[in-house]
Amino acid sequence: MPYVFDERIGRRRFIKTVGTAAAGAGALGALSGCTSKIGAYAHPIAPNPDGLKQWGREAGQWIPSCCNMCGGQSGILCHVVNGVVEKIEPNHWNPNNYSNISSDFFAGYTEEFGCAEGGAICPKGNAGIMQLYDPDRLKTPLKRANPDKSPGADPRWQEISWDQALDEIAAKLRALRDSGEAHKLLWMSEDHSFTHIQADFCKLFGTPNYSMHSNLCDVARKASFTTVMGESRPLADFIQSKYILLFGWNPTSAIKWVYLPRILTRAVERGARLVVVDPYLSDTAAKAHEWVAIRPGTDGALALALAHVIIRDQLYDQPFVEKWTVGFEEYAAYVKDKTPQWAGQITGIPAAKIERLAREFATTKPACVDAWSGPGHHSNGVQAGRAIALLAALVGGYDRPGTLMIPDTRGNTHIELEPDATAAVTLKQPRFDELERYPLGHKSGVYCQMFANLAEGKGPYTPKMLVCVFQNPMMSVPGTDTVAKALARLETLVVIDTMMSETAQLADYVLPGTNYLERYDLTTHWVTWPVVGLRQPVVKPLFGQPAEYETIAALGRRLGLKTGEGVEFFRVGPLSGRPIENLTEWYEDMLSKELKAGAPGITLAELKELPGAVWVDKKGTRYEKFAEEIPAAKLATCVYDGDPKTDGTGIYDKPKALGGKRVGTVIGGKPVRGFFTPSGRIEFSARWLATKKDAHGKPVDPLPAYTPRDWQPTPEFPLYLINWKEASHTQTRTQNNVWLLDLKPDNPLVMHPDTAARLGLAAGDEVWVESPYGKTKAKLKTSKRMHPEVVGLQHGFGHTALGRTARGRGTSDSSLRPTKACALSGQALHKEACVRVYKAVQT
């Protein structure tokens, strides 16, 4: 009799595993192999027909892959029995499960057993089985029969064949392209899955409007660090640090990468002091030596006051500042009056505490400071992030052990395509989201501007069609009513997803997507040296549906999209150069092309044969890369933008006029890597910003100036509203996963008990939460973990669709916020709202 997955048995096993982990590592930390008493023993990935219990594994087939329950891309091993995924465990050969520093990962590593302690995955990774076998998954293409696209209207879905769906969608796309309106196609993509082929499709089709999820996530942080030190995502070397200062980041629960809880807790165990600045006592703050409760949106003021003390008392790293930075004098003059007393009035933090924190941070070596969405999701978030990033510069805290590391994420290489003449014409059209107005904008676009323009009938033209891949803007973009109004203005909305999301409910066509356990991807992991992991199908698509990249390629074939050289891209293997009929084989050829062109230099088949199906550069982490001299052979092909003997002269791979990329700078008379900023150094003052204006037309300050955020409490709306994420769920995606709902079934509104008492409220009350933009109900939870001036919700709940289990659980915060973006970066402002809270009257 064939094996059939039993969800009830699986749930008991999952809860038992999580419970075991919680006893030793905190309720929602990462789950390590040692939780099942496997410890450092081997985890063979070959089929195990005899059931070698000494390795802690059942009989069956173990297939390595990479998780996609969130953007962390952890390595996983999947136990497959008769074509059914029965269990998911960590992949001990993948650094992304263990550490971002090579010396830590390789200590005790063997190709036979992997890393010494065993890797980890989080609760979501374990629950990936239920994401695959969710009974509410979409199974067949659907076409809308009801022209009414308002929320709550019955779409009157008609089931159609895949051929009909693709033919009709291709016909609508062809009509746009043939009429010279290819730019009126909008495209939204999740940014960790098959993004290259989507970008290729949009380019060959002729639309400049390819956008990704990142502008909902961390583009403010990327803008801050890129402006300061030329890298969008420096990585914290916690495990070697002695002082860790975090602004608005919860890495032990809101796990961006599953190695974070391990390296942070190991650092604390080894004597590091941990300080967390946050309005909410997060799980990380609860484990810290000190929680600094701050008013939302005032992180920049605190950072400037810390800098004031460090400079005033001459505690900064003078040799580093003199050699590797510019603009220090301007910056020092700016912070001269940014005293702890000044910041104390703004942040609510006592001046004496600010003085002490500054001295601790500057005198404890090595020190690491970092910030994520806490500061970044406010309208002043980019400048706050710059002020925080410059604290690291003051103490020489970049690319040295125990500091913020310059990542070396060389992996597979995306081969840029040249469009044909037809596409080239419409690609010259401006982006509909007006990205060019955002001086520190990101290639992912500006979702908020896009939806606001569409809803209000503004923008450079009127889009006609949107393809939305694994995105649910009705839940994830601030301003639900604005998003709904915008979507209703489209002639055609196509959604590709595994679930009937709130956005899919408004679509004209819904195509079933694949779960990550059914498809391919290459994942260039976010560690400090080059690593590429493989996501590969461990089971066949449950409903016979094509993977998303196959759907896109099938549309490309129907449209006959060609490159500028006349090659029909989606029919000819990018590596082999020969026609490939099978869509899966064509995509495998594309992945091999990217691997061969990138750091691994191997094919997909060769990657599959490596331990854990992960390529790891054995050279490991390099420190002080900014001081590395450019090799003579490379320098011979480069060009200088000035005198090669003059400090500050830039070195480019080709002339700047031809789009040359900066690869180095002359510093100390030597051609070194430096920092990839306009000056080649860390920039306390980004002087090039002085000529820029933000999206509102306001001049941009070259210094990390503090200004209050746009939305402030008023007598009518007196409370700040914040949100956060936890390891129990992924954004708005997992609330139909019954295993994860066993851990976190809803999201009550958290309020300080003193605030509740003042408002005549009590724990358990049903309350209204109202802002100038919307109103919603919530269940009240009182806790001293919340700042008295603030209320907050875990983001992701409050679904009206997605599935039978998700619907009606908890509260969505998106309806309470304006559809506004940071005027510098385009970051969605998920924390920019103030509310009033009052008891819901029972009727």
Predicted features, each with a name:
Residues R137-Q164, L315-A351, V538-F676, L743-P745, ...:
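N-terminal leader/propeptide and maturation segments of large enzyme subunits in energy/redox metabolism
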Residues D283, S501-L534:
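Flexible glycine/proline-rich, aromatic-decorated loop/lid segments
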